[in-house]
C-alpha cells in the first residue's frame, strides 16, 4: 500500500498552505488508483530529474486539447505541495472558426482555478506549421520574461516523442534530431513576432487575464534571462491521459486537424504506428520511447565533451578587414578526437555563428576543408607565406544565415556576411 507519495513537502510555517495540502491530499486519495499512479509517477520524475523546483513561477502552455488540459490539472493538484505560482498562456492561430470559443474555454478554466491567464491572437493567418510554432514559442517566451516566469511547460507526451522519432528518422535526421523532444531545453529567441498594437496582439477574455502594458514591453528582451522549456509528461502516454480525462471528467477541446491524414505526423499516428503494433510489436511505443531516452542521455554526454573540446580549441583574432571575424581553431586537437566528436564540435560551432541549425552537408564541408589534410597541404603549411598569399588559396563555404566561411590554409576561419 502506497503511503502519501505525492505530498512529500510540508510547510509548518503557514497554516493556510498546510490546510490546502491536506485538502488536496484527501481529494487525491478519493480518486481512482490509476489517477494516483500518474500523479505519483510525475511527482517522482520531478524529484529525480530535477526539471521543476519548489516555489517556481511556471507558465503552462494550454491549447485546450487533451494533453495540455491534463497537464494543467495535474500541476494544479501539485502546486500547493510544491508552492508553485502558475500561469496559463493560450495562443490563437485563427485556424478554425471556433478558435475564439476554444480561447474562452481556456479562460474559464483559468478563472475557476484562479490562475493568471495570458491570451494572444495572431494578427495574420499563418498556415505553415513551423512558422506558427515559431510565432507561438516566441510569444510565450516574451510573456514568460515580462511576467517573471522562469520556465514554460508543455503537454508533450511519450506518444509525441515516438511520433517525432519516426518523423525525424524518415527525414534523415541525426541522433540529435531523433531525440529532439527532450525533457528540458533552453528556449532561445526566434524573432518571429510581427509587432502590432496591443489591441491587435492581445485579446482579453476575463478579469484574470494580464497583457503587455505597451508595445515597448513586448519588444524588450531582458538581458541574461534564461527561459527553459520543460516537458514533464514524456513518460506518460496519450492513452493514459485519455483515461485521466474520463476519470476526472475533464472538459477538453478536440482538435479536428489531428484527424487530417494529409499531414505526415497524423499518418504516422493513425496509420503507421497501428500497423507496427499489429504486425511487428504490440508495445512498439514503449520500445521506441526507451530508445529515445537512451539517445537523449548519450547525446547530453557527447555534447558536453564536444563543447569542452571546442572551448579549448577555439580562439578569436580581431581583423580590420571589412569587419570580418577571424577564428583560429586548433585543428590538431580536433583531429585527435573521434569523428563523432569532430562533427558535434563543428555542428555546435556553425549553429552559433549562423544562428540556425546547419545541415550535415555543411558540417562535412567544413570538416573536410579543415581537418582532412594531404602531403601537399602539409608541406604548404610549412612554407613561409604572408597572409595576402594565403588569402589567394582560401576556400569559401556558403552557410545558412547569409554567412560565408573562408578556410585559410587549414589554419584560420574567416566569417563574413554574404551580401549577394
Curated annotation (Swiss-Prot):
Record GO cellular component, one term: chloroplast
Species in which this protein is naturally found: Zygnema circumcarinatum
> Where mainly found?
plastid
The Swiss-Prot or TrEMBL record annotates one GO molecular function as: ATP binding
Q: Which GO terms describe its biological process?
A: tRNA modification
- What EC class does the entry list? ligase
Q: By its UniProt entry, which Pfam families does this protein fall under?
A: ATP_bind_3 (PF01171)
Q: Spell out the subcellular localization from the entry.
A: Plastid, Chloroplast
Q: Which family does it belong to?
A: Belongs to the tRNA(Ile)-lysidine synthase family.
Comment block on domains: The N-terminal region contains the highly conserved SGGXDS motif, predicted to be a P-loop motif involved in ATP binding.
Q: Which HAMAP family match?
A: tRNA_Ile_lys_synt (MF_01161)
State where ATP binds: 63-68
Q: What is the protein's known function?
A: Ligates lysine onto the cytidine present at position 34 of the AUA codon-specific tRNA(Ile) that contains the anticodon CAU, in an ATP-dependent manner. Cytidine is converted to lysidine, thus changing the amino acid specificity of the tRNA from methionine to isoleucine.
Which CDD domains does the record match to this protein? TilS_N (cd01992)
* Keywords per UniProt: ATP-binding, Chloroplast, Ligase, Nucleotide-binding, Plastid, tRNA processing
The EC number of this protein is 6.3.4.19
Q: Which reaction is this enzyme known to catalyze?
A: cytidine(34) in tRNA(Ile2) + L-lysine + ATP = lysidine(34) in tRNA(Ile2) + AMP + diphosphate + H(+)
Q: What is the protein name stated in its UniProt record?
A: tRNA(Ile)-lysidine synthase, chloroplastic
Amino acid at each position: 500500500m502506497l503511503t502519501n507519495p505525492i505530498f512529500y513537502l510540508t510547510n509548518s510555517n503557514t497554516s493556510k498552505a498546510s490546510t490546502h495540502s491536506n485538502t488536496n491530499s484527501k481529494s487525491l486519495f478519493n480518486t481512482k488508483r490509476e489517477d494516483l499512479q500518474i500523479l505519483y509517477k510525475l511527482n517522482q520524475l520531478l524529484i529525480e530529474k530535477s526539471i521543476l523546483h519548489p516555489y517556481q513561477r511556471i507558465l503552462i502552455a494550454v491549447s485546450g486539447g487533451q494533453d495540455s488540459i491534463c497537464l494543467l490539472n495535474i500541476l494544479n493538484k501539485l502546486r500547493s505541495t510544491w508552492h508553485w505560482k502558475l500561469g496559463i498562456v493560450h495562443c490563437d492561430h485563427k485556424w478554425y472558426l471556433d478558435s475564439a470559443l476554444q480561447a474562452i474555454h481556456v479562460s474559464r478554466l483559468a478563472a475557476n482555478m484562479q490562475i493568471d491567464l495570458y491570451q494572444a491572437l495572431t494578427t495574420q493567418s499563418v498556415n505553415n506549421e513551423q512558422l506558427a510554432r515559431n510565432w507561438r514559442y516566441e510569444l510565450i517566451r516574451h510573456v514568460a520574461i515580462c511576467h517573471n516566469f522562469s520556465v514554460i511547460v508543455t503537454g508533450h507526451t511519450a506518444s509525441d516523442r515516438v511520433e517525432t522519432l519516426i518523423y525525424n528518422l524518415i527525414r534523415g535526421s541525426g541522433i540529435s534530431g531523433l531525440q529532439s523532444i527532450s525533457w528540458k531545453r533552453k528556449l532561445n529567441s526566434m524573432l518571429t513576432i510581427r509587432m502590432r498594437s496591443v489591441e491587435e496582439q492581445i485579446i482579453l477574455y476575463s478579469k484574470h487575464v494580464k497583457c503587455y502594458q505597451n508595445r515597448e514591453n513586448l519588444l524588450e528582451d531582458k538581458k541574461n534571462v534564461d527561459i527553459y522549456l520543460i516537458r514533464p509528461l514524456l513518460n506518460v502516454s496519450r492513452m493514459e491521459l485519455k483515461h485521466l480525462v474520463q476519470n476526472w471528467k475533464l472538459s477538453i477541446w478536440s482538435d479536428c486537424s489531428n484527424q487530417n491524414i494529409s499531414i505526415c505526423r497524423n499518418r504516422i499516428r493513425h496509420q503507421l504506428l497501428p500497423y507496427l503494433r499489429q504486425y511487428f510489436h504490440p508495445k512498439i511505443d514503449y520500445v521506441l520511447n526507451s530508445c529515445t531516452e537512451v539517445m537523449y542521455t548519450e547525446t547530453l554526454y557527447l555534447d558536453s565533451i564536444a563543447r569542452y573540446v571546442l572551448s579549448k580549441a577555439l580562439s578569436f583574432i580581431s581583423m580590420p578587414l571589412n569587419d570580418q571575424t577571424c577564428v583560429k581553431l586548433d585543428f590538431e586537437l580536433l583531429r585527435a578526437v573521434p569523428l563523432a566528436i569532430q562533427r558535434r564540435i563543428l555542428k555546435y560551432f556553425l549553429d552559433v555563428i549562423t544562428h540556425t541549425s546547419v545541415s550535415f552537408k555543411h558540417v562535412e564541408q567544413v570538416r573536410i576543408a579543415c581537418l582532412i589534410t594531404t602531403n601537399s597541404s602539409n608541406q604548404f603549411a610549412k612554407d613561409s607565406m604572408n597572409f595576402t598569399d594565403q588569402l589567394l588559396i582560401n576556400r569559401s563555404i556558403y552557410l545558412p544565415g547569409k554567412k560565408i566561411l573562408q578556410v585559410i590554409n587549414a589554419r584560420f576561419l574567416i566569417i563574413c556576411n554574404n551580401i549577394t
